[in-house]
């Protein structure tokens, strides 16, 4: 009975978002309100649980923890999105997109460059729906039908969400568990390293069918190369550097290696153009691929080395700052020593490292990048204004979900759910752990929010079953990433940019299969690791 009561807030959020199609902000508020009611009436928060501080002290502590964690996450989201909007305003994004498009006339190669490397790069730098919204129109511009464009961009982007927006999904996990960020990033990356090639192969199969061709031997080779050049650097960065740069840095390193090989092959042997490709590509019919490497409207964009450096300045500065503050002890040690901490009676605590926090590094990257790009003040103001407007529903949803999660933890509701899960699933829980992450992302539209909702459940269940906690937390973060291609919010945002509004179900039907396969593979690995 108590387990059912404990599950009610999560079930309510599911019902409101999936059944009534409420936004995450409204559903989160309703779920948080119900969680508070159940915590007080059903679990005795303030009387049987935390009696020393009483109900008022318990509610104040929960609100403080939720508000503090929300602020640390928003400190990342705000400058990350501001950089993205500044890039759009200054034309930096167009330069990067067109430079990729001019590398090959084969739309399947362009799918690797845009739906894989470009979306992963943007996911690492900004995340929160921007990669697919940006990549889908460009894929349509090089000839893919809108439905195919959104599907392959969603699948490609999903591999990098575990470390999206400079590692934002890891932040609530650190706050909830106390594990070192490096431990959590390493535990998450191993799943993508093992199976990340699977969604990429599916992505390329769909892209090839979209061009009226097949997965030929050469495309298999390019696909495997694209997978290896991203997944290996991503894993290495996550394991030895930290959670901020695996997706962004992995995409940058992988793209550089892939493009270098592409240019060498084109120079020595020639990359196939449309006329040299498999039958049906050059005349794929209405909506089929064009041979131009970039949309006509962007044909005159400057893609010289100087223009590319200027366009990528915010991200290059960010990478430099992250490496300096993580790998150079004379810089990192004194900065890490500045920590702000707070605590309230009842064991409510929080800490913040302002000088090395990813949000601070993003703010510096935004300001220095704007200087390099010589962005006018109106463009800076416009980027910030757009970002602040975009943050309103995100802030409400994030705070509501955190209130729900922290209420459940502090009242013992999460512990009760964990005991029920341990009793009913036993040895099968590791297989299900990634699917829990998928469910969270499906409901909330955010890998970060999924981790907010279910990190404590994963920890408590691991303790109940006697499993090693880190592999299950890695599986949670992995699942939160895997669920991105079926998140309705993300599908709506991506589809809207290419005129697919109202056809979201068609996208989901094409992404749900690989989502479930990828998650189950991760679950089988989790079973071995725990």
Please place each PLM-identified region on the residue numbering.
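Interfacial loop-to-helix junctions that mark the boundaries of transmembrane helices
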Residues: 1-3, 21-27, 59-71, 182-190, ...
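Structural signature of hydrophobic alpha-helical transmembrane segments
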Residues: 1-8, 70-74, 126-131, 183-197, ...
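Structural signal for alpha-helical transmembrane segments and their membrane-water exit/capping regions
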Residues: 2-3, 13-57, 78-91, 261-269, ...
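Membrane-interfacial loop-to-helix junctions in multi-pass transporters
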Residues: 3, 70-73, 100-114, 142-148, ...
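Hydrophobic alpha-helical transmembrane segments of multi-pass integral membrane proteins
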Residues: 106-137, 141, 161, 395-403, ...
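Alpha-helical transmembrane segments of multi-pass membrane proteins
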Residues: 108-120, 145-159, 182-200, 204, ...
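Membrane-core helix-loop-helix motifs of multi-pass transport proteins
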Residues: 142, 154-264, 492-525
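Transmembrane helical segments that form the transport core of multi-pass membrane transport proteins
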Residues: 288, 293-440
